[in-house]
């Protein structure tokens, strides 16, 4: 069984150059579920509705991962709700409430999910090896650092904090052989479950632009009588590109 690593045990790599580039940058994250979208904003002359987005808030210090979101630094984060069911229903209101948060510092991207469930006994969770938890309930973060819909890295956690990570291509094909060192924690309770992640910037490659525009997707998967995917915003099933939604 893989045990989630405490954040303090993550081995830091030589990321001096990366951190110098990141210190004065603002990460803009488009927060949705299951399929990546472009993190863009409508200009004054645009007539299209801008896609949902959320500023990435920088913090001082490191978050202690407990799976309970009890570190005071989380109070600085802005929540987003995954309001739509995109599978099996097509853009219908989500039947369960899910909130997500994101923060960052010079070393890590932090994510948290609060997954409410009206029937907590239906939550599926197993203690398993890495990458063997995708049959459970899980939350997943997909990150496309170049915002070009070609490739994204995915980081998933089940209600026991068991990790899964892989590479997703724009076509939807996945490579589960991808394994990196990052931290996670999760807990179950009477109202559902909560998960936290700390992903070091050292696992990513990205361009040298002063302003970074990344696509960051947040997903909740719920296997019940069917597998339910909950999303914020709607998903276009006519778009063949998984990352180019």
Regions found by a protein language model. Give the residues of each.
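Short intrinsically disordered, low-complexity coil segments enriched in acidic
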Residues: 1-5, 27, 206
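N-terminal amphipathic/basic-hydrophobic helices that include classical n-h-c signal peptides
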Residues: 1-18
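Bacterial N-terminal signal peptides
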Residues: 29-39
């Amino acid at each position: 069984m893989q045990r989630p690593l405490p954040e303090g045990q993550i081995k830091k790599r030589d990321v001096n150059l990366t951190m110098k580039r990141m210190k004065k940058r603002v990460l803009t994250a488009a927060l949705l579920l299951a399929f990546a979208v472009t993190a863009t904003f409508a200009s004054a002359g645009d007539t299209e509705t801008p896609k949902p987005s959320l500023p990435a808030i920088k913090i001082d210090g490191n978050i202690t991962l407990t799976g309970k979101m009890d570190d005071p630094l989380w109070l600085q984060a802005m929540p987003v709700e995954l309001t739509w069911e995109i599978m099996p229903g097509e853009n219908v209101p989500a039947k369960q409430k899910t909130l997500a948060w994101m923060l960052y510092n010079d070393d890590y991207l932090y994510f948290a999910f609060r997954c409410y469930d009206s029937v907590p006994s239906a939550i599926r969770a197993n203690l398993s090896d890495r990458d063997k938890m995708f049959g459970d309930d899980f939350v997943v973060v997909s990150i496309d650092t170049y915002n070009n819909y070609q490739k994204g890295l995915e980081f998933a956690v089940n209600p026991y904090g068991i990790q899964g990570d892989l590479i997703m291509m724009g076509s939807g094909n996945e490579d589960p052989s991808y394994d990196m060192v990052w931290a996670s924690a999760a807990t179950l309770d009477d109202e559902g479950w909560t998960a936290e992640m700390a992903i070091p910037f050292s696992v990513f490659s990205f361009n040298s632009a002063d302003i970074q525009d990344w696509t960051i997707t947040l997903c909740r998967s719920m296997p019940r009588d069917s597998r339910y995917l909950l999303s914020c915003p709607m998903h276009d099933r006519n778009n063949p590109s998984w990352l180019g939604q």
